[in-house]
Curated annotation (Swiss-Prot):
Keywords: Amidation, Amphibian defense peptide, Antibiotic, Antimicrobial, Secreted. This is Aurein-2.1. One of its GO terms (cellular component) is extracellular region. Belongs to the frog skin active peptide (FSAP) family. Aurein subfamily. The keyword Amino-acid biosynthesis does not apply. It is found in: Secreted.
Amino acid sequence: GLLDIVKKVVGAFGSL
């Protein structure tokens, strides 16, 4: 769902 996509984006930024 949309929340899953948001979590992936947040996780990506958290990996920077």
